[in-house]
């Protein structure tokens, strides 16, 4: 079932595509952009992108209004998301990024809640089983990309709730 995305009112407002000079207005505008990016990526389960892809995406390019957020402004929005812990640059040139509509700690908490709820403590899973197995089909983390999953499991490992291990066909995790 494909869900349609409901664009916020600002997306239909041409000045939204120009970062405003007034500090207070700009902060509100950046907060709106951050919220939009996270909602859009969450709905589309999009976890990584390049800045060039972002610039051409409907996210930053409103074809109906014929308005596009300039690449310099996109970089500012992305940097704001990084400061909040929702984005990680994948290269030094800052041309590609991992977008996390939930921070790794939040994903870890969701995964661990499922483990506890389903009585899976002291069990070992492959990464594939966790995100693509039948047992997790109804969970929000089902289909989660491996990069984000690993960050979530690393957060759980720091809390001594899990250990990332090597299994015969790749990586796995043991929950405590």
Curated annotation (Swiss-Prot):
Cystine pairs: none
Residues of the signal peptide: none
UniProt note on tissues of expression: Expressed at the mRNA level in kidney, liver, pancreas, and placenta. Lower levels of expression are found in heart, skeletal muscle, brain and lung.
Listed InterPro entries: ESCRT-II_cplx_Vps25-sub, ESCRT-II_cplx_Vps25-sub_N, WH-like_DNA-bd_sf, WH_DNA-bd_sf
GO biological process: macroautophagy; membrane fission; multivesicular body assembly; negative regulation of epidermal growth factor-activated receptor activity; protein transport to vacuole involved in ubiquitin-dependent protein catabolic process via the multivesicular body sorting pathway
Keywords: Cytoplasm, Endosome, Membrane, Nucleus, Protein transport, Transcription, Transcription regulation, Transport
Xref: SUPFAM superfamilies: Winged helix' DNA-binding domain
Superkingdom, natural source: Eukaryota
Subcellular location: Cytoplasm; Endosome membrane; Nucleus, Nucleoplasm
Consequence when changing residue 126 to K: Abolishes binding to CHMP6
Keyword Membrane: yes
Molecular function (Gene Ontology), one example: protein homodimerization activity
Gene Ontology cellular component terms for the protein in this record: cytoplasm; cytosol; endosome membrane; ESCRT II complex; extracellular exosome; intracellular membrane-bounded organelle; nucleoplasm; nucleus
Reported function: Component of the ESCRT-II complex (endosomal sorting complex required for transport II), which is required for multivesicular body (MVB) formation and sorting of endosomal cargo proteins into MVBs. The MVB pathway mediates delivery of transmembrane proteins into the lumen of the lysosome for degradation. The ESCRT-II complex is probably involved in the recruitment of the ESCRT-III complex. The ESCRT-II complex may also play a role in transcription regulation, possibly via its interaction with ELL. The ESCRT-II complex may be involved in facilitating the budding of certain RNA viruses.
Family membership noted in the UniProt record: Belongs to the VPS25 family.
Self-association state and partner proteins as the record states: Component of a complex at least composed of ELL, SNF8/EAP30, VPS25/EAP20 and VPS36/EAP45. Component of the endosomal sorting complex required for transport II (ESCRT-II), composed of SNF8, VPS36 and 2 copies of VPS25. Interacts with CFTR; the interaction requires misfolded CFTR. Interacts (via C-terminal half) with the ESCRT-III subunit CHMP6 (via N-terminal half).
Entry protein name: Vacuolar protein-sorting-associated protein 25
